[in-house]
Structure formats: C-alpha cells, structure tokens
Amino acid sequence: AGEARASLYQALDKARAGEMAESEQCMIEADTQLKKAHDVQTELITRDLNGSLPMSLLLVHAQDQLMTTMSEQSLIEHMIGLIRDIGMNGGK
C-alpha cells in the first residue's frame, strides 16, 4: 500500500502542476498497486479464517495502511476532479 500511496500523492502533485496526463498515469499505477495489495489482504484474511495465520501487530498495521490508502485514493480522485473542473472553468 505504501507504493500506491506515493503514486496517489504524485498524481495529486502532477494535477496541481497542470500535468493531467501524467496525473492520470500515476492514478493508474496506484490502482494497480492497490489491487495487488488487496489481493494479498484477501489471501491473509482467508488464512486467518482457516486458523493458519497468527495475529501480529505488523499485520494489523498493514491492514490499517491499506484501508487508509484506499480512503485517500477516493479523496485524491475527487480532488483531482475539482482541479480539472476549476481548470476547465477558469476558476469560476
């Protein structure tokens, strides 16, 4: 989730700089990275349900990071949309 988070904030920085195509590419990268992290999470949850995965602080932290990054993805998508709207309407 850490790589996805970095890509999300890079996308926001690119959008703020008016580099919308680059911003979109960063968002695509972040989405790909988040899907991979989510797949790993699903695997771990399945193992936990089967009783074959001991609980650890590291796993709790990883879960928290993934959930936070997914929330940030949604917010950053909306922020980039606002930046795009403002740019298209000349700030009006």
Language model: regions and residue ranges:
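Terminal alpha-helical segments
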Residues: G2-K92
